[in-house]
Amino acid sequence: MRIGMISPYSLTIPGGVQNQILSLARALRNKGIDVRVLGPCDGPPPDTGITPLGNSLPTATNGSIAPLAPDPSAQLRLIRALRDERFDLLHVHEPLAPGPVITAIVLKQSPIVATFHRSGPSKSYEYFNKPARWVANRVEVNCAVSEEAAVTARNALGGDYEILFNGIELDRYSLKVPKQAKRSIFFVGRHEPRKGLEVLIRSMRFLPDEVKLWIASDGPDTKRLQKATEDDIRIEWLGRISEEEKIERLQKCSLFCAPSLGGESFGIVLLEAMASGALVVASDIPGYSKLTRGGKDALLFKAGDSTALAKALEKGLYEPWASQ
């Protein structure tokens, strides 16, 4: 069987959906299935078996900025690839994202499986409901990565959704060396209000001087937050880092913090952190609380509350059970 897996987002820019697509493709190949990933790439493809569809364009979506490829040149590259590859099955992710995914569904040269990742209200689902339903009706099997994602899709489009949770490649994250950085907190995610980075930075005011904070990635809030924290030597700004460095940091840090304010349907990075041996401190939002079994597998705090976050971080860093 030959499967074409289509990403709406740039595969060279870190993101939960992109990581899931690349990991799933590798897992299927290990089972002897021929998989090719098609998607935008802003630079050399990050893995083998990828057909680049050109550069991405920053596009506002779900309270964030996504690296999509809605331009005509990307659609022409996709059409050419579908014609040449002749896939037996297409697996599209975020089926209503502008760009190659919708193009593939409209053309429909093979049976289609679609996976919905996003959760929460969507203006595009609301404004373009009729054409969105037409597109969705061309899909044979609809999947969602969480109940929240399924509810979002069902409310907008109707239909049935099989919930297939995200997964990770455990061997890549398993802790191979002892923890090396005591009293260290790691954050990775786009620097924008929805991800709650500013809440985390405010919480540092309540923590002892020995606590270190590593901040990876970048975004529209980066320069402002760097300026506001330029006198705090405890905070290290890492910029965009490779997947390998992300895993290394997860394995070295004392705890991983996910302070998102909302809009998270699953939170795969929490799985990555737990698999790496890091304690997780996360906001008490549906996408995180269900993943952590109501807080049994993480310390949860009220989203947006920097004081509550500081208390959770201090508990994770200093109470004996947290290091076990």
Task: Identify what each model region corresponds to.
Residues 6-14, 21-72, 80-81, 219-220:
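N-terminal strand-loop element at the rim of the active site
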Residues 41, 148, 167:
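Carbohydrate-associated surface elements
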Residues 120-142, 149, 155-156:
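Membrane-proximal helix-turn-helix segments that form the acceptor-binding/catalytic region
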Residues 151-154, 165-183:
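Acidic anion/phosphate-binding donor-loop and adjacent secondary structure
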Residues 176-208, 213-214:
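Conserved donor-binding/catalytic core segment of Leloir-type glycosyltransferases
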Residues 223-247:
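Nucleotide-activated donor-binding/catalytic signature segment of Leloir-type glycosyltransferases, i.e.
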Residues 279-282:
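Short hydrophobic beta-strand element within catalytic cores of glycosyltransferases
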Residues 294-295, 299-306, 315-321:
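Conserved acidic donor-binding segment of nucleotide-sugar-dependent glycosyltransferases
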